[in-house]
């Protein structure tokens, strides 16, 4: 019996998240990508399932990133706080939906403050 190697698989959330920067008159926008690392076939099926529920994931992420501070958006440590919150929040959502919480990584792939 040969074990299949783990495969990284990504899903770029097709939404630009926008809102107010906490304590300022500024607005922000950011984009998010999530990833899993599991055996190839499972990885493919998992990302396919996430893609089918992407609208729900957008709703969850929107609530998770409300009113970030400028420091959170501009610093490496702050962006890590945001991505950790997204990672934990989405996995908790998947558990509530009866799915395995297999999102291993969350990334902010674009940030703008105006």
PLM regions: where:
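Flexible, low-complexity charged segments
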Residues: 1-114
